[in-house]
Amino acid sequence: MDSLTVNVVTPNGLVYDHHAKIVVAKTTDGEIGILPKHAPIIVPLAIDEVRIKRTDSDTHVDWVAVNGGIMEVRDNVVSIIADSAERERDIDVPRAERAKQRAERLIEEAKAKDDRDQLRRATVALHRAINRINVSKHG
């Protein structure tokens, strides 16, 4: 049976490296599923979860919180390069909750000051924190 080699890399190093049956990720255009023998492709990723069904289990799925980046598929290798990414088991939930609260506070401040740049940054920070919290629930 064919399989995929999946690796997730950030500036801090390798976050994930395993063999998989399927990888599902959210691109900026929508969700994409990658199976073995997929055509070569490079796509930008949205801030979202990546689901990886491993070859060593019919039921186990690995979840990775990815904060944007790109995904390249070539020769049954799926490479995800992201500014930051965390496996569900590595997420510090209290820290993610604090980041969520901080982002919500910054959004309110930005709205009060009509600061569009701060609002945009705080909204992205909120999305990242919520993504990490959601992915941690799969662990």
UniProtKB/Swiss-Prot annotation:
Keywords carried by this UniProt record: ATP synthesis, Cell membrane, CF(1), Hydrogen ion transport, Ion transport, Membrane, Transport
Record keyword Cell inner membrane present: no
Keyword Lipid biosynthesis carried by entry: no
Transmembrane segments: none
Membrane topology qualifier: Peripheral membrane protein
Pfam families: ATP-synt_DE, ATP-synt_DE_N
GO MF annotation terms: ATP binding; proton-transporting ATP synthase activity, rotational mechanism
Cited function: Produces ATP from ADP in the presence of a proton gradient across the membrane.
Family: Belongs to the ATPase epsilon chain family.
Quaternary structure and interacting proteins, as annotated: F-type ATPases have 2 components, CF(1) - the catalytic core - and CF(0) - the membrane proton channel. CF(1) has five subunits: alpha(3), beta(3), gamma(1), delta(1), epsilon(1). CF(0) has three main subunits: a, b and c.
Protein name: ATP synthase epsilon chain
Organism of derivation: Enterococcus faecalis (strain ATCC 700802 / V583)
Primary gene name: atpC
